[in-house]
């Protein structure tokens, strides 16, 4: 049983991945081709390390190292990137490996709304690990607000870390 379950989001939390505006410019510059799709986040090519140099978020990385040093910890990465997209998992794994980021489990969205995916996953992981404390790192403001509501409904202590503001909110639960 792990006392603390840590969850790290991927895009703009662990790593500074390209957004659709700068990413499309970079794609065209490196490949000489126009971006061939309408969407961005659902495409494995957005994480192609031959095109993009994805850097880790140093502030989050320091917290990741603290979590790794916690002997009673279980670490997961949870991303809204879709599992069913060919090449997505491989590209994410390549970026994680480039930055020596290792997790007990890596989870990609099985489909649908990212917030719903993550809350269901977190509930499963809290049950699986039997943790006393759940710590999550994320960057999406609209999700963080909903995660705060979600946190108050659980029997474990929850810490939500807003990696943009570099603030954490703790919820003591019984």
Predicted regions and their residues:
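C-terminal cap/substrate-recognition subdomain and adjoining C-terminal extension
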Residues: 2-5, 71-74, 81-174
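Alpha-helical substrate-recognition element adjacent to the catalytic core
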Residues: 3-115
């Amino acid at each position: 049983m792990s006392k603390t379950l840590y969850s790290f989001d991927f895009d703009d939390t662990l790593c500074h991945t390209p957004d659709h505006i700068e990413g499309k410019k970079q794609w065209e510059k490196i490949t000489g081709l126009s971006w061939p799709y309408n969407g961005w986040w659902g495409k494995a090519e957005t994480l192609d390390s031959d095109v993009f140099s994805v850097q880790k978020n140093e502030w989050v990385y320091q917290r990741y190292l603290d979590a790794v040093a916690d002997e009673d910890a279980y670490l997961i990465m949870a991303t809204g990137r879709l599992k069913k997209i060919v090449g997505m998992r491989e590209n994410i794994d390549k970026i994680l490996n480039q930055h020596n980021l290792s997790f007990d489990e890596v989870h990609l969205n099985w489909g649908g709304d990212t917030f719903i995916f993550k809350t269901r996953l977190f509930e499963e992981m809290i049950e699986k690990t039997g943790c006393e404390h759940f710590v999550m790192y994320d960057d999406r403001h609209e999700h963080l607000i909903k995660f705060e509501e979600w946190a108050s409904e659980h029997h474990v202590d929850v810490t939500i870390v807003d990696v943009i503001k570099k603030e954490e909110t703790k919820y003591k639960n019984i």
